[in-house]
Amino acid sequence: MKKFIELLSEPILATLEQKEKEIWDVEGRLKNANQPFKFDIRPLKQVNNKAEKIGYFKSKSDKMVFETINQWIIFDTEELNEYVKSTDKRDFNIDELLNNLSWNLILDKVE
């Protein structure tokens, strides 16, 4: 996720306490954007042969970042939480979220 931080202007890393209690990792402004955000950039983890990322309703992050092979996919944390609360499901795939959430941003990785 260090590569994602390179996409931010003047990034500020969260303290250990902020990571644990507020559940965000870095604050910064995407280059060519005008508003700073707190990003949850925790990586996906392999669990039962699935890549997953656990979200938390108490998160103080503004945006949640998912890394794929070729892209960074960013969702609005509040909208994501509201969507999760509105369903009976606990597992969601990226395509479903892209189709059902209005705020998302896809950034292609540049090597």
Region locations from a protein language model:
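C-terminal/domain-terminus segments
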Residues: 78-89
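A short catalytic or substrate-binding loop motif that flags glycine-/basic-rich loops and adjacent residues
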Residues: 17-22, 56-58
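Polybasic/polar functional segments that serve as interface/processing modules
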Residues: 22, 29, 38-40
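Intrinsically disordered, low-complexity regions of eukaryotic proteins
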Residues: 27-29, 42, 110
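Acidic-basic catalytic patches of nuclease active cores, encompassing PD-(D/E)XK
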Residues: 1-20, 30-33
